Amino acid sequence: MSGLTHFDAAGHAHMVDVGGKQETQRIAIARGTIRMLPATFALIRDGKAKKGDVLGVARIAAIQGAKRTADLIPLCHPLALTRVAVDFELDDALPGVHCVAQVETFGRTGVEMEALTAVQVGLLTVYDMCKAVDRGMVITEVSVREKRGGKSGDWKAEDTAG
């Protein structure tokens, strides 16, 4: 199991010891997309969904998702997040919505999982609020786009289109 930090020498799962790591500013940016029917897109764009402000509710859900990541992903460390920012971009061409989450902390481990969870929960909330009119929505292309801080340094996805 070499290279996989969440397994010990015997192959058993464990939470990685970060006690000896330096505390640094950690930032991660994740992005994902939900594709939908044009009529569903219009409901969101025009603020006419029966359940209310889809993107407003999805933003709050995404922030809550980032905060609850350690409760959902068994080997994630609970982190004191210093910032969670979530933005939605309407894309007429898809049609669909892009979700971008930036998560920050000052600590010993990165916040990539928190950023990914924020995006997923935000997009799942869009699905939940619109599924009555469009069960065929597709959540896609969820990925970490950038991370900063820590021993491994900064990283940015080569495909900067997303």
Swiss-Prot record:
It is an enzyme of class 4 (lyase). Pathway: Cofactor biosynthesis; molybdopterin biosynthesis. It comes from the Bacteria. It catalyses: (8S)-3',8-cyclo-7,8-dihydroguanosine 5'-triphosphate = cyclic pyranopterin phosphate + diphosphate. GO terms for molecular function: cyclic pyranopterin monophosphate synthase activity. SUPFAM superfamilies: Molybdenum cofactor biosynthesis protein C, MoaC. Substrate binds at residues 75-77, 113-114. Its EC number is 4.6.1.17. One of its GO terms (biological process) is Mo-molybdopterin cofactor biosynthetic process. Keywords: Lyase, Molybdenum cofactor biosynthesis. The active site is at 128. Pfam families: MoaC (PF01967). Homohexamer; trimer of dimers. Belongs to the MoaC family. Catalyzes the conversion of (8S)-3',8-cyclo-7,8-dihydroguanosine 5'-triphosphate to cyclic pyranopterin monophosphate (cPMP). This is Cyclic pyranopterin monophosphate synthase. It comes from Burkholderia ambifaria (strain ATCC BAA-244 / DSM 16087 / CCUG 44356 / LMG 19182 / AMMD) (Burkholderia cepacia (strain AMMD)). The lineage of its organism: Bacteria, Pseudomonadati, Pseudomonadota, Betaproteobacteria, Burkholderiales. The gene is moaC.
